[in-house]
Amino acid sequence: MKKLIALHLVFIATFYTYSQSLKTLATATTNQNIIDYVHSVDSTIIVIDFLQLKKSKWKSTFKTVSGLILSGGKDVGPKNYGVKDTFNLCITDPKRDEVELFLLSSALNDSLPILGICRGHQMTNVGQGGALYQDIPLQHKSDIKVIHRDSLQENYVYHDIELDTTSALFEIYGTRHLNVNSFHHQAVINEGGSMRTVARAADGICEAAEWGKGLDDRWIIGVQFHPERQFKTESIHTKLIKAYIEACFP
């Protein structure tokens, strides 16, 4: 007999909106990587795509969830961090921004665990008053060159990052250095709220941020890379989703 579902997980579709049954993940038609990542820990988790819900249902549906994942996708709209699209380079999704800002605010109010991935990491900071580089090559100056996105925008590139040894992220991974994938042209320049940078690339770009210690015991971690695309070949990345799920469902 299939065990009862005890944990609901909020999920915002990466790149495309998909038809989602609230009873099973079997009808998912996109971003199988995130679903596989979650189910590598617990295959009974229900994933709710709020982009498929009417706005009138957001509040009542959110009351059923135990955690929030904000995944990768298009650029966060610059107006959300108080600037114009200076370089006319941003490809945005205003509807998704609206949904995610609601979800983030609700999760913060309820002290729910939050995992941000790539865009989701950026949104976790922007939603708390942080800001982004609109374009790393144009705005970030460093003597050390790190490629954060394939110039053809077709493939992931890889580079090393260094973790803060006082961070929860370091405790999870158990190593100071990681080689991570990368597919982004924007990055966090100012952390939002009580977030603090806990990993950087060699050029100084923020590669991860988390809720500051000593404030309370809430679990909020954002990573600029895509662990859901590495965990099948590099099992160390399973540690992150496992820690997150354990925080959602202790």
Predicted regions and their residues:
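Active-site-proximal beta-strand elements of phosphoester/diester hydrolases
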Residues: 221-225
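N-terminal beta1-alpha1 cap of cysteine-dependent amidohydrolase-like domains
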Residues: 2-11, 15-115, 125-133, 137-166, ...
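Active-site nucleotide/adenylate-binding loops and adjacent lid/helix of ATP-dependent enzymes
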Residues: 175
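Phosphate/adenylate-binding glycine loop and adjacent helical scaffold
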Residues: 179
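C-terminal closing repeat unit and adjoining cap/tail of repeat-based domains
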Residues: 217-219
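The feature captures the ABC ATPase H-loop/switch
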Residues: 121
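Active-site glycine-centered loops adjacent to acidic/histidine catalytic or metal-binding residues
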Residues: 118, 184, 226
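Conserved beta-strand residues within beta-sheet cores
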Residues: 182-185, 194
